[in-house]
A protein has these predicted regions:
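SDR active-site strand-loop-helix element
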Residues: 6, 30, 67-68, 109-115, ...
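NAD(P)H-binding glycine-rich loop region in Rossmannoid oxidoreductase-like domains
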Residues: 41-94
Length: 171
């Protein structure tokens, strides 16, 4: 399968990309810093700069994975909060626009979200949550919700599976 990963150079992304490549998938990683990440992966992973993407490299993509976004483990100033939210929304729109412009229609779009979307009462270890559980009203819950809603634009592609990957705390 041909898989594009946006945000593949982060802690979790590196593990996912390496695992997919080891299983024989054709993996392309989109990065904002090509020079820094060119040698991050084995030779069977293509690392491509966001600003100079060659559409022919991404044609026939089966799966698009979006893991990128401003880190949340920093002081939440007004400016940082804006970056945390907008980095997720804007990158979804950029990926969508790129797909439309270049007639790339993935079968699956996997979007990284977080368990922070749930109400804080759900943080109790004795309490299970699923996609029908109560959503929270914290800043992070709102970021998760807006991030997930931003993927709705991909619904114009018939038969696409949009998957919201609600990840827990990664240490």
């Amino acid at each position: 399968m041909k898989i594009i990963v946006a945000g593949g150079t982060g802690f979790l992304g590196k593990k996912i990309v390496s695992s997919l490549a080891d299983k024989g998938h054709n993996v392309c990683v989109l990065t904002r810093n090509l020079h820094k990440h060119k040698k991050t992966f084995s030779n069977n992973v293509k690392v491509i700069d966001w600003s100079t993407i060659n559409p022919s490299l991404l044609s026939d993509t089966n799966i698009l994975i979006k893991l990128n976004g401003e880190k949340v483990d920093q002081l939440w100033t007004k400016s940082v909060k804006s970056k945390i939210l907008n980095s997720r929304i804007d990158s979804t729109k950029m990926l969508f626009d790129f797909c439309v412009k270049n007639e790339i229609i993935p079968q699956k779009f996997i979007n990284a979200s977080a368990v922070g979307i749930y109400a804080k009462e759900s943080a109790n270890y004795n309490f299970s949550v699923d996609e029908n559980s109560e959503l929270g009203n914290t800043f992070l819950a709102k970021v998760c919700l807006e991030n997930e809603r931003s993927t709705d634009i991909f619904k114009v592609f018939e038969d696409i599976d949009i998957i919201q990957l609600r990840i827990g705390v990664v240490l």
